[in-house]
């Protein structure tokens, strides 16, 4: 009953955070106000009308041309739903490379514009890929329910709040030019607390997990702030940063590096924290009187097994996300020293190292917090068994170094008692 009440309260508070957070983030947010007015209806290609190639001449390049494909499509969403429209796809080998040409039955996104004479002109924008992604997401959620059952449902709910906190609150706040540092800390804290309570309930283990995770995230954040100054970072790591600056000059690009590192690392740090907290909770529950030093030592031993795989996971995730950039720069004619001093590469390395250090510091932090909270517990229990009006006390098993000695003492006492009884019987016979 208590767990249900806690779950319901956290669920309501999470909804309140999303609603109020979105209102604060959207305050005076002119960028998203403009984006929300844009409409890209979906359509399905019904036939190809014309394909026209026009050669273009670029210095030093041969066989460059523009291709205009005129096609008919049926609009499947928006105010023009079910209408047949004529649209154009433009492909330039000089700019776009090998973009796939539209074919019959392709699902596409369209854009409609009006000429001065009031005539509608439709253009191909992009292929509609959401349907396949939705199917894949449903498979993912189905597997969570299949393997997790009740906890799987809680995991799905926490995942929904995590996604909403990023896309409904955090990103609008950044685009609105608000304090990225503050919003990053708030978002990571919300994700951590809501996830561990919704999935694992409210307990000492949950408290240890949350505190350990937040501590690891703060260490990664402080390290990032220090390195931002030492590395003379500007935040202009690629062309996307330039576009962001043009959208809103109030956006702090250096703070985006900070936010990217913390948000990217919070999941792995939380994973390490819950692994250690859960393991130490089990270890402490088997001790009659848990000792601080023993729990800390166990936490460090468990952490040694975790750190290798989790650190590799984080570093490989960062490398994989920027693999094309790494390949391009590696294949260039620049020296290794030049490549490693590029801000783009420096930021990638900083992300991997700061996140990994956050994971490593989470291990001792979580171990110490767990030892502090778990060592107050008294797990000694005496079970009483009643039979024939006589009260017999059963000795609880102890998991400590004195177990063997206690067993020897009990065995000796039993043998002494048995010997005494035998002697008395012998005397009575005589």
Please identify what each model-predicted range represents:
Residues 93-131:
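Extended, hydrophilic extramembrane loops/domains of integral membrane proteins
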Residues 1-38:
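Hydrophobic secretory-pathway targeting helix
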Residues 36-67:
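Structural detector for short beta-strands of small beta-barrel domains
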Residues 1-13, 129-137, 154:
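Membrane-entry signal-anchor segments at the cytosolic-membrane interface
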Residues 138-245, 251-264, 268:
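Transmembrane alpha-helical segments that form the functional core of multipass membrane systems
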Residues 221-357, 366:
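Generic detector of multi-pass transmembrane helix bundles and their immediately adjacent loops
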Residues 301, 305-308, 317-430:
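Hydrophobic alpha-helical transmembrane segments of membrane transport and translocation systems
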Residues 3-8, 204-217, 309-313:
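Alpha-helical transmembrane segments and their helix-start/interface "positive-inside/aromatic belt" motifs
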């Amino acid at each position: 009953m208590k767990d249900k009440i806690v779950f319901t309260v956290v669920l309501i508070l999470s909804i309140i955070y999303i609603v109020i957070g979105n209102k604060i983030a959207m305050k005076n947010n002119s960028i998203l106000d403009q984006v929300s007015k844009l409409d890209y209806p979906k359509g399905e290609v019904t036939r190809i009308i014309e394909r026209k190639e026009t050669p273009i001449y670029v210095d030093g390049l041969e066989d460059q041309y523009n291709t205009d494909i005129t096609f008919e499509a049926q609009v499947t969403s928006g105010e023009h739903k079910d209408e047949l429209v004529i649209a154009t796809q433009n492909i330039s080998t000089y700019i776009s490379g090998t973009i796939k040409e539209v074919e019959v039955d392709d699902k596409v996104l369209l854009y409609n514009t009006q000429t001065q004479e009031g005539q509608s002109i439709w253009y191909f924008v992009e292929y509609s890929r959401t349907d396949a992604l939705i199917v894949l997401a449903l498979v993912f959620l189905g597997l969570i329910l299949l393997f997790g059952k009740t906890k799987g449902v809680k995991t799905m709910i926490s995942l929904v709040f995590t996604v909403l906190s990023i896309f409904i609150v955090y990103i609008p706040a950044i685009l609105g030019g608000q304090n990225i540092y503050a919003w990053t800390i708030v978002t990571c804290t919300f994700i951590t607390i809501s996830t561990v309570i919704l999935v694992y309930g409210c307990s000492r283990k949950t408290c240890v997990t949350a505190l350990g995770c937040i501590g690891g995230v703060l260490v990664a954040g402080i390290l990032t702030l220090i390195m931002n100054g030492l590395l003379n970072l500007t935040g202009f790591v690629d062309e996307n940063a330039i576009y962001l600056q043009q959208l809103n000059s109030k956006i702090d690009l250096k703070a985006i590096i900070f936010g990217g590192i913390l948000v990217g690392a919070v999941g792995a740090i939380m994973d390490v924290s819950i692994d250690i907290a859960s393991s130490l909770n089990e270890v402490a529950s088997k001790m009659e009187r848990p000792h601080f030093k023993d729990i800390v030592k166990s936490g460090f031993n468990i952490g040694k097994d975790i750190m290798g795989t989790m650190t590799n996971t984080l570093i490989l995730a960062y490398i994989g996300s920027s693999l094309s950039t790494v390949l391009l720069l590696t294949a260039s004619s620049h020296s290794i020293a030049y490549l490693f001093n590029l801000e783009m590469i420096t930021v990638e390395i900083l992300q991997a190292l700061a996140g990994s250090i956050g994971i490593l510091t989470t291990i001792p932090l979580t171990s110490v917090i767990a030892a502090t909270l778990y060592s107050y517990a008294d797990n000694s229990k005496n079970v009483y068994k009643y039979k024939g009006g006589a009260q017999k006390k059963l000795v609880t098993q102890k998991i400590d170094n004195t177990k063997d000695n206690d067993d020897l003492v009990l065995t000796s006492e039993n043998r002494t008692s048995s010997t005494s009884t035998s002697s008395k019987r012998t005397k009575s016979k005589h």
